[in-house]
From Swiss-Prot:
The modification O-(pantetheine 4'-phosphoryl)serine is found at S35. Coiled coil: none annotated. The gene is dltC. PROSITE patterns: CARRIER. It comes from the Bacteria. Keywords: Cell wall biogenesis/degradation, Cytoplasm, Phosphopantetheine, Phosphoprotein. It comes from Lactobacillus helveticus (strain DPC 4571). One of its GO terms (molecular function) is D-alanyl carrier activity. It is found in: Cytoplasm. Carrier protein involved in the D-alanylation of lipoteichoic acid (LTA). The loading of thioester-linked D-alanine onto DltC is catalyzed by D-alanine--D-alanyl carrier protein ligase DltA. The DltC-carried D-alanyl group is further transferred to cell membrane phosphatidylglycerol (PG) by forming an ester bond, probably catalyzed by DltD. D-alanylation of LTA plays an important role in modulating the properties of the cell wall in Gram-positive bacteria, influencing the net charge of the cell wall. This is D-alanyl carrier protein.
Length: 79
């Protein structure tokens, strides 16, 4: 499974929405995600992709669209 599909699967589980056609939509501004969902998302991403994203270092502006989430996960996978 590629990173994009894995991220979309997690977001679908958390939001109940297929976001594949909304890759640049802000998932916080449109009400699909809140702070509790952010924590769940980070935990799911860490488990699925074996990456480390401390909640204390989470900057919502860097993770607010599906495309940004995919890019962050890919950069953390390459560390």
């Amino acid at each position: 499974m590629d990173t994009k599909q894995g991220v979309l699967d997690i977001l679908n589980d958390l939001t109940g929405e297929d976001l594949s056609d909304q890759m640049d939509e802000n998932i916080f501004d449109n009400g699909l995600m809140d702070s509790m969902a952010s924590v769940q998302m980070l935990l799911s991403l860490q488990e699925k992709f074996d990456i480390d994203v401390p909640v204390s270092e989470f900057n919502r502006a860097e993770w607010d669209t599906p495309n940004k989430i995919v890019a962050k996960v890919e950069s953390l996978e390459n560390e």
